Amino acid sequence: MSKKLVSLFLALLMICSMANVTAENNTITVTDMFGREITIEGPVTRVIAMEPSDCEILYALGCGDALVGRGKYCDYPAAVLEVPAVQAGQELNLEEILALNSQVVIMADMAQTKEQVTLLEQNGVKVIVTDGNNIEEVYENIRLLGKIMGKEAEAEAVITDMQKTFADVAAKSEKTEKTIYFEVMPLEWGLWSAGANTFMHELAEICGMKNAFADIEGWQQVSQEQVIERNPDYIVLVTGMGETAVDEVMGRAGWENITAIKNGAVYNADSYAMTRPAPRLAEAVVNLYNFLNGVTE
């Protein structure tokens, strides 16, 4: 074989090798919060995010432009309202999703998620399932979406910012035996609160407080009698019931001897920042600290 042919052969081998490396580099494999290993052909530039928290994470990573669809309840930041909305939760609409031709659909772990994942994947849609009960799982979600979007460094930066805020608040918070009752669902719908292994429980601890329902696990329904018996020092409302929420709680029959009611220590929190497993939990803990310590901005 002549030197010229050898050189040509080696050049072809190099080109093929580079092509294989490029193909491998464009393949993204992740394990979602269901423990499922998912392989996606990258780069990922077309995404549907069904949950508000996942939309917020994507924007925090600088990936808002990749959103071609959003769940109808996704509303932050304001720019996301320009993205086409699709039905979410139990009302998921397969045709709407298929029409948007996304590379991946990101959805949260809910009661109907397994059936919906099966339906979507049977129709050729890649699905990533997220979950975020506690702060560590929020970090996992951020890293997961960061890997999918090729924004791993940005994901770590977002997490570092959150950790710094939590550490700063914890450092200036005195430990106390005082308790917080988080009202997640209002009385008219049946009271629900946050227990152990939730990010709300952890926000209370960061602020030096105890969770009045630390003995329950996750998010559970509670009774008026339980709230009255536990006599919380503070009540934090994350019900999204608007400006009248505090007045409604202050006027509840039988609650008048609760310490929080007697002291007027009822806080109508930004329910979106405090209920979504997303970067704005850092904002939520600052606001919670300010309420607990009487700090005005």
Task: Kindly give the residue locations of the regions a language model identified.
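A ligand-binding cleft/hinge motif common to bilobed small-molecule-binding domains
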Residues: A111-Q122, E229, Y234-R252
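Bacterial Sec-exported substrate-binding components of ABC uptake systems
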Residues: K4-L5, L10, S17-C55, E152-F182, ...
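Short secondary-structure boundary segments
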Residues: E51, D109-M110, V184, I216-W219, ...
